[in-house]
């Protein structure tokens, strides 16, 4: 149960936005913040792309974007959409006809880039295809591909130019009576992105897709995204997000959920709270946590686990978690269940035992949730 009524410093008031749908996934309004990723396979490698989409979905992705750079990719998209367990967004640049073909292939959403999609006449044809095939649209502004006239006006990529680009294209869609759209204003610079998104949030009620584009590798990109997206989410801005990493798309999904979990905006799987370890540790905390992260990946039920090396903070942290283990002496530690000290367990048997306790707790929570749902019917 949420305790935010007595912890007002944890409350995040989300910006009010219109709700649209990307396939069967609601975006905006009071819908959960959707986690997205993007495949990095050749789209024409249908088998490989479907496998990557499935892996991302298994990791929790709500929506997956697929690049459609040519006609062959548009043809391949039809089978990818058919086999995908989640809605597919077609990533469209330069060639507006690819957007039309992607809509015909069954894409749930078309991402268009104002900087290279072409004039209003071409956009109008994409809008018609989207409407005809029940497709939403994302206006995806990028600092690295702004329209020439905006670069001339502002002298360089900047938040004002990005937001102006986005609002200009919102007007085009609205002038054609098309309202199933979301918008993003991405840059690789955290400051520019954050400023642009704040301006955008004040200027429109459209659902906002968050991202720091070209953020970097797994470590550097995670840090940049956590800072950039984290502050915006804390302000209540954002209806969907993608963490852009030069890494496996599954890692993007994991990082996205960790950012949301850290702010209490979405909960999926086991939230492990662990200490950095020091000379006081009663067991090898680092190796234990690494092993538990791997062995508990199959748990989707939201729950918490504390793994603390000694009694300085261990008992206190365990009070706030579903399952906990605190290191002690003589090769054993204390297991905590529902915040209370339960029983001792030897260090060499602890990992297997913790996995068992977490699985039992997850099963109990799932059963309770099913019972509550049945009672509410």
From Swiss-Prot:
Pathway: Isoprenoid biosynthesis; isopentenyl diphosphate biosynthesis via DXP pathway; isopentenyl diphosphate from 1-deoxy-D-xylulose 5-phosphate: step 5/6. One of its GO terms (biological process) is isopentenyl diphosphate biosynthetic process, methylerythritol 4-phosphate pathway. Its EC number is 1.17.7.3. Its cofactor is [4Fe-4S] cluster. Gene3D superfamilies: Dihydropteroate synthase-like (3.20.20.20), Sulfite Reductase Hemoprotein, domain 1 (3.30.413.10). [4Fe-4S] cluster binds at residues 275, 278, 310, 317. The keyword Lyase does not apply. InterPro entries: Dihydropteroate_synth-like_sf, IspG_bac, IspG_bac-typ, NO2/SO3_Rdtase_4Fe4S_sf. It catalyses: (2E)-4-hydroxy-3-methylbut-2-enyl diphosphate + oxidized [flavodoxin] + H2O + 2 H(+) = 2-C-methyl-D-erythritol 2,4-cyclic diphosphate + reduced [flavodoxin]. It is an enzyme of class 1 (oxidoreductase). Binds 1 [4Fe-4S] cluster. Pfam families: GcpE. The keyword 4Fe-4S applies. Keywords: 4Fe-4S, Iron, Iron-sulfur, Isoprene biosynthesis, Metal-binding, Oxidoreductase. GO terms for molecular function: 4 iron, 4 sulfur cluster binding; 4-hydroxy-3-methylbut-2-en-1-yl diphosphate synthase activity (ferredoxin); 4-hydroxy-3-methylbut-2-enyl-diphosphate synthase activity (flavodoxin); iron ion binding. PANTHER family: 4-HYDROXY-3-METHYLBUT-2-EN-1-YL DIPHOSPHATE SYNTHASE, 4-HYDROXY-3-METHYLBUT-2-EN-1-YL DIPHOSPHATE SYNTHASE (FERREDOXIN), CHLOROPLASTIC. Converts 2C-methyl-D-erythritol 2,4-cyclodiphosphate (ME-2,4cPP) into 1-hydroxy-2-methyl-2-(E)-butenyl 4-diphosphate. Belongs to the IspG family. This is 4-hydroxy-3-methylbut-2-en-1-yl diphosphate synthase (flavodoxin).
């Amino acid at each position: 149960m949420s305790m935010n009524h007595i912890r007002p410093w944890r409350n995040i008031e989300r910006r009010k936005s219109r709700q649209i749908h990307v396939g069967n996934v609601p975006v905006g309004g009071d819908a959960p913040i959707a986690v997205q990723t993007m495949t990095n396979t050749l789209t024409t490698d249908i088998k490989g792309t479907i496998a990557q989409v499935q892996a991302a979905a298994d990791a929790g992705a709500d929506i997956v974007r697929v690049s459609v750079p040519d006609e062959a990719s548009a043809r391949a998209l039809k089978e990818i959409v058919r086999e995908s367990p989640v809605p597919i967004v077609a990533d469209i640049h330069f060639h507006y006809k690819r957007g039309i073909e992607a809509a015909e292939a069954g894409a749930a959403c078309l991402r268009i880039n104002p900087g290279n999609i072409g004039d209003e006449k071409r956009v109008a044809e994409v809008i018609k295809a989207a409407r005809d095939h029940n497709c939403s649209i994302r206006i995806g502004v990028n600092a690295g591909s702004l329209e020439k006239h905006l670069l001339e006006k502002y002298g360089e990529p900047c938040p004002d130019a990005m937001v102006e680009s986005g609002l200009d294209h919102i007007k085009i869609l609205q002038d054609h009576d098309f309202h199933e759209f979301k918008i993003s204003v991405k840059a690789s610079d955290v400051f520019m992105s954050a400023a642009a998104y704040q301006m955008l949030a004040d200027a429109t009620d459209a659902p906002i897709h968050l991202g720091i584009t070209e953020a970097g590798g797994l470590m550097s990109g995670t840090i940049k995204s956590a800072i950039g997206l984290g502050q915006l989410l804390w302000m209540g801005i954002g209806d969907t997000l993608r963490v852009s990493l030069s890494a496996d798309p599954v890692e993007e999904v994991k990082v996205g959920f960790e950012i949301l979990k850290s702010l209490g905006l979405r909960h999926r799987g086991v939230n492990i709270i662990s200490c950095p370890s020091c000379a006081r540790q009663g067991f090898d905390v680092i190796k234990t946590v690494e092993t538990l992260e791997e062995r508990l990946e199959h748990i989707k039920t939201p729950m918490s686990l504390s793994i603390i090396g000694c009694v300085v903070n261990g008992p206190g942290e365990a009070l706030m978690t579903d399952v906990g283990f605190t290191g002690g002496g003589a090769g054993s530690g204390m297991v905590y269940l529902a915040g209370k000290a339960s029983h001792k367990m030897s260090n060499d048997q602890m990992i297997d035992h913790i996995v068992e306790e977490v699985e039992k707790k997850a099963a109990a929570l799932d059963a309770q949730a099913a019972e509550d749902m049945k009672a509410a019917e």
